[in-house]
Amino acid sequence: MELNVYKVMNTIINKTIIMCGIFSLFNNKYAFKNKYINEQFMLGKGRGPEFSKLEQVHDKLLFGFHRLAINGLNNESNQPLKIDDVTLICNGEIYNYKELYDMMNITPSTDSDCEVIIHLYRKYGIEYTLQMLDGVFAFVLVDNRIDKENNTSGNVYVARDPYGIRPLYMLTLSSNMFDKLDVLPPIYGFASEIKMFSNIYQSFIKNEIGNNYKIEQFMPGTYSKLSINISSQPIWRVVKYQQTYTMPGFSSTKMLVDNDYDSIIKNIQTYFFSAIKKRVITSERPIACLLSGGLDSSLVTAIVNMYMKEITDVPLETYSIGLEGSEDHKYARIVADYLGTNHTEIVMTEEEFISVIPEVIYAIESYDTTTVRASIGNYLIGKYISEHSEAKVIFNGDGSDELCGGYLYMHKCPDSIEFDKECRRLLKDIHTFDVLRSDKCISTHGLEPRTPFLDRAWVQYYLSIHPDIRCHTKNKQCEKHLLRDSFSGKYFVDKNGKPLLPDVILWRTKEAFSDGVSKNTRSLYSIIQEYTSLDDTKEEGGEQHEDMERNEKKYYKDTFNSYYPNMEQIIPYYWMPRYCSASSSSARTLDFYNEKMNH
């Protein structure tokens, strides 16, 4: 089977749907015409296929919003949301909005959970607002009130949730001269996807306008402020750039003093049950779970199933995907039978996996090898659910390996301090890799992903546990031992005395999603490399694998560049295992893989 990126790419923009999406553009008065801007805005319509609106909300400030309604299903909840002089666009879900309204003694004017952001901001300001929100979000808020103290006629705040679960990109275009006569003010933009800015960005480069143009990830856990100064040139300027308002978890100086194991187990259960329950009860749309049969997705599915049984008699929908004979199908079926879910096995061919790669790269806006491999199955399962189910809210098990140190290479971690450091590094960068995949592969099909393992309170508690207890390598235990033990039959059974999961699932060794979709004897990475390698690399020899790996990377990068030229900086580095000699990101290539799988 031949892969022709140039043949496939021309069909993707018309066939790819992209959950809610936001778009904003500052200081665009002379550079781009409204018709052109609207065309770029509409490239993101798939994230919110149910409603779209582009609106001028302030002088030289344009807001755009695409909506997929999860809560507040009436038209009054459409965005931009406006209360007096404050206007908001937000891609997110605020899980504690009802509690916040009760605390403020405020009756909302719409059913949108995002409206609470405006009320919090008006009463308490931006920093306290961000501390109070429990949810996932990327938002742009404009305050049109004149601020005499700071001499401004408008202030805008842009913010993103602590782990970047909702995507957000920042566009910066600066020019010394425009038409060689008029000074062109700097243009700023914020959007949920690169594709809404790509053509605008390329036009600056192509026409050699200016000396500063970039598209970058807006950092999680930060906010920025833009203002118009009354006494100077009336343009929007960045006055505070990505100011940190939260850190991913507690610092090492705030570890728990009480290390009583039974108390820790109880707290782990309490925080994680809460993380899932809030995500179940705040959805007004049907729910489904992605179920690979691994520990993480199985834990999430089991607890979602437990809460759904309190709400409805209709069995929870679960989905697994893989090639014929894949490891994930086998274990997912065990979990589904144990829990009594309405399970669907999606069996795909090698050709179906391979042929969709260009679509995947266009959707996820990345060329990182690990991310692309893992995204193929994610993208196809999202596509299947969107075409065959009424479910709109899709639970996943992503984030656990970063938080709990679940990757197999962590067995080579030298000590518990390094273990803690590596977990925090993985969480800090997760928006560039796994979270990017888990959001875009699902939202690209008009669905909303929910990721309870990255719940703010849960993450902060888990990281507050002393590393000696979290670090399985120190105690020569299987990966994520503390998490597994916390939900084992020893510590948790339901009202009928039944464990949450069978032991064969609870203690199943970590298998990457991109590996688990295939057989042990024929891994997905090797299938891809067969298709993407050049003929002259298919020779016997010690360097054959490295050549095939390079060709795979080149194919992904070339495909990415065909959609998003001059944007290679959007990923900071290639994701790779650490603490060991690795030429591939697949755990199946590591020297100790078979040892762990047979343990």
State where each predicted segment sits.
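ATP-dependent adenylate-handling active sites, centered on carboxylate activation for C-N bond formation
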Residues: 10-18, 26-32, 145-148, 155-157, ...
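Short, solvent-exposed coil/turn linker segments
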Residues: 193, 243, 466-468, 502
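Short alpha-helical linear motifs
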Residues: 81, 108, 485-486, 535
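Conserved S-adenosyl-L-methionine
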Residues: 502-508
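Cysteine-centered catalytic environments shared across enzyme families
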Residues: 16-366, 392
